[in-house]
Amino acid sequence: MFVTFDELPPPQGGALRRITRSLRDKIKPPKPEIQKIEVCGSFFFDVRAYWKDGRLLQAHERSLLTGRRGALAARGLTLPQGFRLAVSEDQVARLRAEVLCNTLLRALQRSALPLYCRRVGLIDPECLYPFLLEKLIKYCPVVLVCTDRPERYAPYAERMLEEYGAPITFTGELPALGGCAALLDLGALPLPSFYPVPVFSMRAEPIEHNLSLVLPHYGLPEADEAIPPGIDRDEFYTALWQLCGVEAVGGLCASSMLCKSRRVTVPQIAAQLSQNQEQVRILE
């Protein structure tokens, strides 16, 4: 469970009414509005209150949902005293990585690539996402990992060999990934050209010299309707996943991704994968 914070809307009506309401609220601010919102079999609390210079009025802090410390605030607002950010940057990054991995696998499954051609490269310089190995190895017979810390991957690689009979190949050189059908780019290394191989990337912007796929759009209809205004989408979904136990979030695929200047769908990416053996560039 977590809490979201946003501002109450400014007074409505004519000029005189707004001035009167504003003066009255300064003398005796209205209490925060607290609403329990049910979503995806769980719930969170949405709090609307008056803020000044991005901070909640001190008189209201004592009336807020004591004991519920994890919170998200709308952009430009500071969390009230006693509350902490509901999710960490690392947790948000993990969800993004999961969505990218799920989307890559969905595209491979929808493509006409035979199983023996499903060779995938995982770029993870700092070894932050070894847990993705099992997802990848279930659908890809060959997984190459480009990392500077292969020793951290060793326990995961050993388990993949024991449970699936699949050896994991490690490299510290990006060009070694050149024969892959698709790449999962979870680092910030400068990439050489892998055209026309789709590169599913955590980066904020596409890499011009690659068939770079970034900014996945994902979601659950029920959750999309429940996101309060101003709340960061990735943080909200991470909180649903990590704090509310909505497991469906961890299995989400992107409905579209940004490729150069336009959005492309999973079927379009799958078609590119299918045609890459003939060097046909569908996503151009």
Residue ranges and their predicted role:
Residues S88-R106:
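A glycine-rich, Thr/Ser-enriched phosphate-binding loop motif common to dinucleotide/cofactor-binding enzymes
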Residues L79-R84, Y129-F131, P150-A157, P190-P192, ...:
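Short, charged/polar "capping" segments at the starts of alpha-helices
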